[in-house]
């Protein structure tokens, strides 16, 4: 799907992030509908966060400095002593060990013996985890119980190289992943077949969308078994035909098509100059003028030296400052008629010849003037 010819000729990043190729050709009816599984989650069917503390060994001189990071040293001593190695009598100062936090996500219905990915992140002064191996690390859940055990070779996406007078770094060498690095040891108890009702949690709570989901489910089942509890929750009773077989009910429900209702919203990321304008954004009639003021200050100091063989002369640096002020072109007022759609709004702003960052200020000013019927969300 492509944008209309001549659309957004100069706005740069706004071309990609305004999503105009989708919003301007706004679909209707079934084309705008989404599956319930893409709009909501079933309560209880969720991931669980796991975390653990471990040691990465086998680093090439890029590990923690044990004199500075005492918890790494104590952890190493404890691990070696559990393996029967006496370390108390000698000096222990390796540079190939690093303490790390290990995190992972236990997916719903993960069974004992299955594997999950884990992420490792350095805690101490380690410069890189490249080439390291994570030693056996228990991963605990929010209840303090161990659900998985992690171990394996770390995959690092970055690197760091340092010499006596220069260094080069790419990516984040102190963080990495271990694919299938954790073995599930305990399952999260969840009896799906015994459920008498199912709660559907909307990812973007909305009264209208919740009501439409309930209506779609009732129309499919042929009876009033679904009702919205609030903008983010729809309760569905397990009907007689699905008793003891909630999996079949959830499978049928998640495939139903519902057209979600969205809030008119403009999302702005001032740090990157990113603007995302929703399809439903409308504005009242407003006149806009935008002026650019650029001030350039350039320092070009000159060195003044005394004449040859002169007495008492000294070399001096004479400052020289050049200031240029560019007020830009005299932009006239641009009138934006009320009730325009996204294309008309962006085209009117483009007529001012401004970039994304200036457009952020303009959109905020339109909102302050009460002419924009939309919510502005600043990231």
From Swiss-Prot:
The keyword Signal applies. It comes from the Bacteria. PANTHER family: FLAGELLAR P-RING PERIPLASMIC PROTEIN FLGI (PTHR30381), FLAGELLAR P-RING PROTEIN (PTHR30381:SF0). GO terms for molecular function: structural molecule activity. It is found in: Periplasm; Bacterial flagellum basal body. HAMAP family: FlgI. One of its GO terms (biological process) is bacterial-type flagellum-dependent cell motility. The basal body constitutes a major portion of the flagellar organelle and consists of four rings (L,P,S, and M) mounted on a central rod. Belongs to the FlgI family. Assembles around the rod to form the L-ring and probably protects the motor/basal body from shearing forces during rotation. The keyword Lipid biosynthesis does not apply. This is Flagellar P-ring protein. Keywords: Bacterial flagellum, Periplasm, Signal. Residues 1-32 form the signal peptide. GO terms for cellular component: bacterial-type flagellum basal body, distal rod, P ring; outer membrane-bounded periplasmic space.
């Amino acid at each position: 799907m492509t944008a209309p010819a001549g659309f957004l000729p100069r706005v740069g990043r706004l071309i990609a992030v305004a999503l105009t190729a989708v919003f301007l050709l706004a679909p209707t009816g079934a084309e705008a509908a989404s599956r319930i599984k893409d709009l909501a989650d079933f309560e209880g069917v969720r991931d669980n966060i796991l975390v653990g503390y471990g040691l990465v060994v086998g680093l090439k001189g890029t590990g923690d400095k044990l004199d500075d990071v005492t918890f790494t040293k104590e952890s190493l001593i404890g691990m070696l002593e559990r393996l029967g190695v006496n370390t108390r009598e000698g000096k222990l100062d390796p540079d190939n060990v690093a303490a790390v936090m290990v995190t992972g996500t236990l997916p719903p219905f993960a069974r004992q013996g299955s594997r999950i990915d884990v992420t490792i992140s350095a805690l101490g002064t380690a410069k890189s985890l490249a080439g390291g191996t994570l030693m056996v690390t228990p991963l605990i859940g929010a209840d303090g119980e161990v659900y998985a055990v992690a171990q394996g070779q770390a995959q690092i996406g970055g690197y760091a190289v340092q010499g006596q007078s220069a260094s080069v770094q790419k990516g984040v060498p102190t963080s990495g992943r271990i694919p299938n690095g954790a073995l599930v040891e305990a399952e999260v108890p969840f009896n799906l077949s015994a459920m008498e009702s199912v709660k559907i949690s909307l990812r973007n709570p909305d009264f209208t969308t919740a009501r439409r989901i309930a209506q779609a489910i009732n129309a499919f089942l042929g009876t009033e078994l679904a009702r919205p509890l609030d903008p983010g929750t729809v309760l569905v009773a397990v009907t007689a035909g699905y008793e003891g077989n909630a999996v079949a009910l959830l499978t049928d429900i998640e495939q139903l098509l519902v057209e979600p209702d969205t809030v008119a919203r403009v999302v702005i990321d001032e740090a990157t100059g990113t603007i995302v304008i929703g399809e439903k954004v409308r504005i009242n009639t407003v006149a806009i003028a935008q002026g650019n003021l650029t001030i350039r200050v350039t320092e070009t100091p000159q060195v003044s030296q005394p004449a040859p063989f002169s007495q008492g002369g000294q070399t001096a640096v004479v400052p020289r400052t050049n200031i240029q002020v560019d007020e830009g072109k005299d932009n006239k007022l641009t009138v934006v008629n009320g009730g325009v759609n996204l294309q008309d709004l962006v085209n009117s702003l483009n007529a001012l010849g401004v970039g994304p960052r200036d457009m952020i200020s303009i959109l905020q000013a339109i909102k302050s003037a009460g002419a924009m019927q939309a919510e502005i969300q600043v990231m």
